[in-house]
């Protein structure tokens, strides 16, 4: 039988992507580290931040101008300058950078968790945006007047084409134009899966079997596989999804 704390996560993961609450699911990932985490309190904090961003944008908004670079820059300025969010360059692999509650408390994180903060604040402020599961560095995209604009959530910069070439060069062996498919919007499950893979890598490198198993159990709910089941069992756990049961994702 699955652990009780996985039940709500599995229920949310079974929803259609449009109905999946990204912030809630991301906060539930932290429940293994923080039992009894007050998820609703953190959602309320995002609501307050989103309302603040919406208020800042009111003075800027003009009819037909909701996709301007100036509007996106204003929203980013609110998150990074006024609220004070920043990338944690000093301790990039601190697991607290991957727990959304810690990111909201400490206001530092890595690209993917800062992207979740951006996406949640933007959604509440009326700024259209989506995550981008770019290799090696998660991004955020927002519609612009002449095509999508891309944001580095680590520092809140709007990226130029050359910036994207350099980012792609980190995994391609030299600056080069990324395949357009790498810049497509990521669905919410992809965001959660990538968050879990980051934590998986951290705890595997540390040899932290207990925390690694907890992450793998959540990962298997999103991406069931025999390989994951075997790894969970090898770590002393029980697969949340028995092989005879239907998988949540097809």
Language-model region placement:
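A structural boundary/capping signal
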Residues: 1-240, 248-250
């Amino acid at each position: 039988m699955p652990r009780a704390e996985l039940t709500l996560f599995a229920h949310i993961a079974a929803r259609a992507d449009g109905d999946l609450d990204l912030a809630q699911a991301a906060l539930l990932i932290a429940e293994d580290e923080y039992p009894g985490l007050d998820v609703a309190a953190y959602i309320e904090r995002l609501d307050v931040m989103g309302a603040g961003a919406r208020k800042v944008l009111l003075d800027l908004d003009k009819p037909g101008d909701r996709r301007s670079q100036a509007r996106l820059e204003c929203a980013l300025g609110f998150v990074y300058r006024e609220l004070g969010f920043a990338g944690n360059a000093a301790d990039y692999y601190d697991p607290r950078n991957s727990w959304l509650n810690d990111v909201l408390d400490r206001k530092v994180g890595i690209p993917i968790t800062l992207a979740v903060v951006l996406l949640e604040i933007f959604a509440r402020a009326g700024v259209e945006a989506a995550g981008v599961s770019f290799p090696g560095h998660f991004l955020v995209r927002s519609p612009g007047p002449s095509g999508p604009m891309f944001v580095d959530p680590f520092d809140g910069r709007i990226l130029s084409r050359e910036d994207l070439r350099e980012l792609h060069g980190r995994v391609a062996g030299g600056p080069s134009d990324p395949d357009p498919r790498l810049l497509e919007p990521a669905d919410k499950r992809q965001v959660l899966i990538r968050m879990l893979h980051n934590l998986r890598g951290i705890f595997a490198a540390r040899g932290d079997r207990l925390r690694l198993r907890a992450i793998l159990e959540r990962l298997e709910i999103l991406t069931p596989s025999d390989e994951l089941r075997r790894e969970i069992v090898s770590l002393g756990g029980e697969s949340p999804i028995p092989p005879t049961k239907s998988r949540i994702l097809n």
